[in-house]
Amino acid sequence: MSKVVRSSKYRHVFAAQPKKEECYQNLKVTKSAWDSNYVAANTRYFGVIWDAAGGGSFAVIPHEASGKTTSVPLFNGHKSAVLDIAFHPFNENLVGSVSEDCNICIWGIPEGGLTDSISTPLQTLSGHKRKVGTISFNPVADNVAVTSSGDFLVKTWDVEQGKNLTTVEGHSDMITSCEWNHNGSQIVTTCKDKKARVFDPRTNSIVNEVVCHQGVKNSRAIFAKDKVITVGFSKTSERELHIYDPRAFTTPLSAQVVDSASGLLMPFYDADNSILYLAGKGDGNIRYYELVDESPYIHFLSEFKSATPQRGLCFLPKRCLNTSECEIARGLKVTPFTVEPISFRVPRKSDIFQDDIYPDTYAGEPSLTAEQWVSGTNAEPKTVSLAGGFVKKASAVEFKPVVQVQEGPKNEKELREEYEKLKIRVAYLESEIVKKDAKIKELTN
């Protein structure tokens, strides 16, 4: 009996290895062991965390500047290593960074890109007591970002006003990922305690939580429409993929073993085409799956294979895809010295706009102000048609940062409390120095 082949318009999606001249070469990508993607992108630029001594730096490079680089200007205002970066979704000339120095910085990108290094951010946000590991901007509310830190806290910020909006508690260990849902009303986190948690950040309430993976290595979670995707490791160190309904956050709707490689899986979800991309750190493969609403909820499509292992990955906004070539996704793959564009395409010959694979997509325009969002208002993301092709925004959106004055202790009690906090911070930093000294001795012996 012949096997019935499942029908899907994405069954033959393919990706090809880019040409050398299309890659960004001679880059000094960070050697940090932190489980970040190391790269982020908007329609004009991509940013990559830099390997720099004596502080934290990252580069922002225009997409058209492919080929060999000689001298790259940097954003270099952090006092310790940069751990994560994210572009503002509504302002192409703003980028945020977080660091081991406990600060969140918002930087302005000059029109046309950097020509000289910049050391002074437009805005510095302080409030975390340990290193800040992740940053992500709200997809609908203007100037709202979320960060997570080694102090086990998740904080939301108004980056223009320089204010901490809300603080989410409830984690008992290091937070390994923190992502918004599609309309910015909830966040999902994963933690070293092996749990995935869905929060309402405006009320500091846990919507649901579950032990998602039994392995000791890091896990990650993202929203995929009304589902939650988690990736992590089993007790026997196999890489796993789970799909959950966050309203019944107990048993996964689907649980798959991906392989037995050792690197963390990085998940990316394309809401327009319902495609999930999985890229493994330390290997050169990018698997992609189609998600559906009924069991088994996920179908493997294909795999991009490369001999060059990736250290990080990100995807560009759908607005800058080449629709005339049926390009449905474009990723940027990070290696130790290059960033390589990977284009995913549907093999079709027609030059007519293919509206079945290009529904209206995320417009990159705010639906809410920060004030509306924090008051409890929800809204759907604005969308735009790709039928007319990609049109760059005429100019940057105005950004007027308000610098908050940091008030010192007002009396003896507050002074003593601040003193005790600083003692704890000094003890933590001293322990980190001891660990790094031991690591240096181990590597030199």
Swiss-Prot record:
Q: Name one GO molecular function term.
A: actin filament binding
User: Keywords on this record?
Assistant: Actin-binding, Coiled coil, Repeat, WD repeat
User: Which cellular compartments is it found in?
Assistant: Cell surface
Placement of WD repeats on the sequence: 77-117, 127-167, 170-209, 259-299
Coiled-coil spans in chain: 410-444
Q: Does the record bear rRNA-binding in its keywords?
A: no
InterPro entries for this protein: Coronin (IPR015505), DUF1899 (IPR015048), WD40/YVTN_repeat-like_dom_sf (IPR015943), WD40_repeat_CS (IPR019775), WD40_repeat_dom_sf (IPR036322), WD40_rpt (IPR001680)
Record has Repeat as a keyword:
yes
Stored Pfam families: DUF1899 (PF08953), WD40 (PF00400), WD40_4 (PF16300)
GO terms for cellular component = actin cytoskeleton; anterior cell cortex; cell cortex; cell pole; cell projection; cell surface; cell tip; cleavage furrow
**What assembly does the database describe for this protein?**
Binds to F-actin.
Q: What does this protein do?
A: Required for normal motility. Participates in cytokinesis.
**Which family would the database say this protein is a member of?**
Belongs to the WD repeat coronin family.
Protein known as: Coronin-A
- What's the name of its gene? corA
